[in-house]
């Protein structure tokens, strides 16, 4: 599987801002579409193939384990409601679509708070310290220090040249690629966290 592009994120999860979805994916799997985390045992797996990932997921689910699967770490208990099985959930676009469905529900649950929605995405609850910590980690993955004012507009005195594309700069096309040998991320109970 090749790297997940920003275009793929926008195509597969168009109702979620691409930078938000990319930050969730980075926090959850580091961009590894075959990542598995067994919440029951705390064990994380990095299968070498789709067949191995699906086989392992089926085995763990049949044993009654709660397992997070794929790019956005979709929980196995959500699969029936999402119409997915252990094979389909590892397809990057299917996984991103499922993440979109869960995040949209979390957005509604949180009353339109992104931090609350991220909390609910991770814990099922829009409030609480565990969800707040998760939300902060997702924001950090997005590189957000000071976010934009929602719905904000530039002051009238700002020159229009700032809004014009610069022809001397190539267009930005970020790509998310899981690089196991370069990734500081290692599995933990809430997704993939830093190895210290």
Task: Tell what function each PLM region has.
Residues 1-59:
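Export/targeting segments at the very N-terminus of extracytoplasmic proteins
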Residues 7-11, 39-46, 60, 82-93, ...:
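Second-shell loop/turn segments in exported
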Residues 28-32, 76-81, 124-126:
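Solvent-exposed loop/turn segments at secondary-structure junctions
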Residues 42-45, 51, 94, 98, ...:
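Catalytic and substrate-binding regions of cell-wall glycan-acting enzymes that process beta-1,4-linked
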Residues 49-116, 139:
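Alpha-helical segment that forms one wall of the substrate-binding/catalytic cleft
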């Amino acid at each position: 599987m090749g790297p997940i592009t920003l275009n793929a994120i926008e195509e597969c999860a168009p109702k979620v801002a691409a930078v938000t979805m990319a930050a969730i994916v980075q926090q959850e799997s580091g961009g590894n579409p075959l990542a598995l985390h067994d919440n029951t045992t705390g064990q994380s797996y990095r299968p070498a193939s789709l067949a191995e990932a699906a086989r392992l997921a089926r085995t763990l689910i049949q044993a009654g384990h709660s397992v997070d699967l794929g790019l956005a770490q979709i929980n196995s208990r959500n699969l029936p409601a999402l119409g997915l099985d252990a094979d389909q959930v590892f397809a990057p676009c299917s996984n991103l679509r499922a993440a979109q469905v869960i995040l949209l529900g979390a957005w509604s649950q949180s009353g339109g708070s992104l931090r609350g929605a991220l909390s609910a995405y991770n814990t099922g609850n829009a409030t609480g310290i565990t969800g707040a910590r998760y939300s902060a980690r997702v924001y950090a993955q997005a590189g957000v220090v000071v976010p934009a004012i929602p719905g904000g507009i530039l002051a009238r005195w700002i020159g229009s040249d700032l809004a014009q594309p610069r022809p001397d700069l190539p267009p930005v096309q970020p790509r998310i690629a899981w690089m196991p040998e370069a990734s500081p991320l290692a599995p933990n109970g809430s997704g993939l966290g830093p190895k210290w």
